[in-house]
Amino acid sequence: MEDKNRLLLIDGSSVAFRAFFALYNQLDRFKAPNGLHTNAIFAFHTMLSSLMERIQPTHVLIAFDAGKTTFRTEMFADYKGGRSKTPDEFREQLPFIKEMIEKLGIRHYELANYEADDIIGTLDKMAEAPDVNFDVTIVTGDKDMIQLVDGNTRVEISKKGVAEFEEFTPDYLLEKMGLTPSQFIDLKALMGDSSDNYPGVTKVGEKTGLKLLQEFGSLENLYENVETLKASKMKDNLIADKEMAFLSQQLATINTKAPLEIGLEDTLLKEKNVAELGQFYDEMGFSQFKSKLLADGGGEVTDETVSEEIKFEIVTDKSSVASVNADDFFYLETLGENYHREQIVAFAWGNSEKIYVSKNLDLLTEMKFPENTYDFKKNRVLLSHLNIELPLVKFDAMLAKYLISTTEDNKISTIARLFDVGHLATDEEIFGKGTKLALPDDEILFDHLARKIRVLARAKEKMMAELIENEQEHLLSDMELPLAEVLAKMEITGISVSQNTLEEIGAENEEKLASLTREIYDLAGEEFNINSPKQLGVILFEKLQLPVGKKTKTGYSTAVDVLEDLAALSPVVAKILEYRQINKVQSTYVKGLIPQIADDGKIHTRYVQDLTQTGRLSSVDPNLQNIPVRLEEGRKIRKAFVPSQDSLLLSSDYSQIELRVLAHISADEHLIDAFKHGADIHTSTAMRVFGIEKAEDVTANDRRNAKAVNFGVVYGISDFGLARNLGITRKDAKNYIETYFERYPGIKTYMENIVREARDKGFVETMSHRRRKIPDINARNFNVRGFAERTAINSPIQGSAADILKIAMINLDKALTERQSKSKLLLQVHDEIILDVPLEELEDIKALVKQTMEEAIELAVPLKVDDNTGKTWYEAK
């Protein structure tokens, strides 16, 4: 699954206020040379730096309150009344906090008549749209924000100053308070909020409010059944304060439809303004921040650094091509990211002293390319469009940076900053983005390319030194670079796709959708927009009176998990679930794949080699790794993927590779023994964990539960998570996990040791020394630390499995080349390799692929490969 954008939304007003009081007892110590108090600025910067390092957001916005008067004060005049006067020492710092935020490349925003909560809630709602791909982290000191948590949004509440946060997710909220996000609003309505000065219901505190909501589910349902309560003072208060309770509910509800003048695109994180930031630090007296800026690649923070002069030669004829040296760098520029559809717009080569730039593509046919570049795979594909075969290089700066650190992107501007080799503007600053993407004037274009060459040339020595220190140089030379060549060949080859088959599948889906629509209308008793959650909610929960599971910020939740719980209560729900699944296949894969078919009748996906933190490959334009296979309509999509003439598709898939890797690195004798004897590992686990003596007595359900335990342990699952997955009690889930570790003690030891190693070193490694940094392994926040521990446990397993697959692909490509075989590698999907194999080579190549994959690496247990062939990908799988 492709990595999501990470949106960080910060309640600037709340966090800045807490920052001020975090260092309030040192107010006189924190002063700028001009006498300005700086304690809030300093603490806010410290908090922000920590968040940026931990979350690594792609998009950030800091929201501020615009003033005391908002639409809520119009509803309730005393809203936020009675607060103490804001200290002057804090008020004077706010403008400078905002100035600092701007220089850090972060957007801040405020909106008249609305609070920061509403800005954040509205942007969070935008990030839920189906056509965007965001995970959202909200940071605040205000618990009201908890109502915004959902599957893609977590809320971190500052607990102590600005250094410690409590992370809320739907699961954590349910575990801690027994509430859903919408119920949290109702809790605030009942108990009121002394900070915001609305009273709720007299004498109802958190404990009573929770008890009422656990009994009645919602504020509305409570008041519909208030007469059923026993006579008491609480009942009298509820009845007397009904109007205030519902007003408090309105006041507590965050407005997710505020009329913002910005969108998600405006939250994109920009480069720091190094020169201005350095000057700001000087003015504030922040010497340690200035020192870190210099250490992080800010250089001498002056105007000269930002606009450091660069000299280059513009080449129009072939005379200078002969001057290319093997030790030089070369770089090819395109305007868009999808290089299968883009053309080279300019290129550059040279070293830190002498640089050449050109737009004359004819020169490329005469060039003897240097041995250093950035993104070899992209260059190999682009040059193939000109019938030029680029030899494999010795150094790829993009891949080197990826191996050194996966916690930030691998752009050349990032390399410039991390390795302190000068300032480089981002491509976004030069070319624009979205609809504003365009080539600049040649003068700007050539200057930018020349600066890229200089950064790459200056950074190489530092990058190689770090690779050698980390024992990773072999990963670059023996794995990632050869793999880049294999992937380039696969991308250039592409896979044939039948548009007619896709259209036929599409027509079948449309018929099914039309039939399902009629059935749903009949069962519902009226026509409505099935794709509208709001209209669907009215049908299910008001007309059909189905029990309300949970609510969203805008009404009834009709999420998949909610509908699955209701499926047994009404036949219309099962039909709606089926409709949704088919509709997604139709829109995303049938209609989505057809435009991706190139003129040669093939789809040429792009494999992203430098994205995931574990080393796994991802696929984009289109993503062929996410075609659904659990649904027949999804599997049918694979019928459109076909071999070349007189060939078959061969699918070879590693069996349970991650569990085999776990057996090897944990050295657990029982797991090793099961694999060595060819036992069904899930059946074996069921017998050991559930106390079943004979394999034939293991039921399908036993095996399914054991499988969930096996893979759950690999991913560091908790008893809470396992209980949800299996539909059992937490007590039973805890017993399963404890018994598992008793039966497989080597796994328990591995998990304890790898977490300890991560704490000591700050990173974990695969069997090939691929590193993943674990920055939160010592976090004080329980949830953050727990996630880091699970990541530490899983990363060596998943990463080692990914490395094994890469080794197999490299060896297989080499073997096919040596045999001068006509068979070709086409796709890599998860643990599966797909080849196009001529019929006359089929038996030999099947044996070769199986042997090559199973012998890719020697483990304590055998690797096992399952293979199938077919006239379509559907048949081969």
Swiss-Prot record:
Positions of the 5'-3' exonuclease domain: 180-272
Function according to Swiss-Prot or TrEMBL: In addition to polymerase activity, this DNA polymerase exhibits 3'-5' and 5'-3' exonuclease activity.
PANTHER family, sorted: DNA POLYMERASE I, DNA POLYMERASE NU
Residue intervals passing through the bilayer: none
The keyword Nuclease is assigned to this record: yes
Enzyme Commission number(s) of this protein: 2.7.7.7
GO molecular function: 3'-5' exonuclease activity; 5'-3' exonuclease activity; DNA binding; DNA-directed DNA polymerase activity
Disulfide pattern: none
Family of this protein: Belongs to the DNA polymerase type-A family.
Source organism, top-level taxon: Bacteria
Stored SUPFAM superfamilies: 5' to 3' exonuclease, C-terminal subdomain, DNA/RNA polymerases, PIN domain-like, Ribonuclease H-like
Assembly and binders: Single-chain monomer with multiple functions.
Protein name: DNA polymerase I
InterPro entries assigned to the protein according to its UniProt record, in alphabetical order: 3'-5'_exonuclease_dom (IPR002562), 5-3_exonucl_a-hlix_arch_N (IPR020046), 5-3_exonuclease (IPR002421), 5-3_exonuclease_C_sf (IPR036279), DNA-dir_DNA_pol_A_CS (IPR019760), DNA-dir_DNA_pol_A_palm_dom (IPR001098), DNA/RNA_pol_sf (IPR043502), DNA_polI_exonuclease (IPR054690)
Biological process per Gene Ontology, one example term: DNA-templated DNA replication
Keywords tagged on the record: DNA damage, DNA repair, DNA replication, DNA-binding, DNA-directed DNA polymerase, Exonuclease, Hydrolase, Nuclease, Nucleotidyltransferase, Transferase
A Pfam entry, by short name: 5_3_exonuc_N
Catalyzed reactions: DNA(n) + a 2'-deoxyribonucleoside 5'-triphosphate = DNA(n+1) + diphosphate
All residue ranges annotated as the 3'-5' exonuclease domain in the record: 312-468
